[in-house]
Curated annotation (Swiss-Prot):
Role summary: Accessory subunit of the mitochondrial membrane respiratory chain NADH dehydrogenase (Complex I), that is believed not to be involved in catalysis. Complex I functions in the transfer of electrons from NADH to the respiratory chain. The immediate electron acceptor for the enzyme is believed to be ubiquinone.
Name of the protein in its database record: NADH dehydrogenase [ubiquinone] 1 beta subcomplex subunit 7
Subunit and interaction comment: Complex I is composed of 45 different subunits.
InterPro entries for this protein: NDUB7 (IPR008698)
Pfam families assigned: NDUF_B7
Keywords assigned by UniProt, alphabetized: Disulfide bond, Electron transport, Membrane, Mitochondrion, Mitochondrion inner membrane, Respiratory chain, Transport
Predominant location: mitochondrion
Domain of life of the organism encoding this protein: Eukaryota
GO CC, alphabetical: mitochondrial inner membrane; mitochondrial intermembrane space; respiratory chain complex I
Length: 112
């Protein structure tokens, strides 16, 4: 694991791909909650932990790669959520603008 960047979970067109297969996850007994886009890094990390009797200093490269992937996933979800919130805010503003155009006098605008 040392000396190279982990494989990207993004395709050239921007879509996502799972690197670890369902069979690999089942073979390594990964819980469903850990079967995400970083599972391909968790499998060697867990193997290293088992083979070194969970010595914390022996699997640092694998742990760093896995935690980096998890952080990147967090940032990706955060960006997607902010884009979704912005789209909803713009949609709400358009609906409000259609209901209450600014060029109508105040008396004509429904307040309820």
């Amino acid at each position: 694991m040392t000396g190279h960047a982990p494989e990207s979970t993004f395709n050239a067109d921007g879509s996502r791909k799972m690197i670890a297969t369902q069979q690999q996850c089942e073979d390594k007994n990964l819980p469903l909650s850990f079967r995400d886009y970083c599972a391909h890094l968790l499998i060697p990390l867990n193997d290293c932990r088992v083979s070194t009797y969970y010595a914390p200093w022996k699997c640092m490269d694998e742990k760093h790669a896995y935690e980096g992937c998890q952080y990147d996933e967090y940032l990706y979800r955060k960006i997607k959520k902010s884009e979704q919130d912005e789209a909803e805010r713009i949609k709400r503003e358009v609906v409000i603008e259609k209901e209450n155009p600014k060029d109508r006098p105040y008396e004509e605008i429904k307040l309820s």
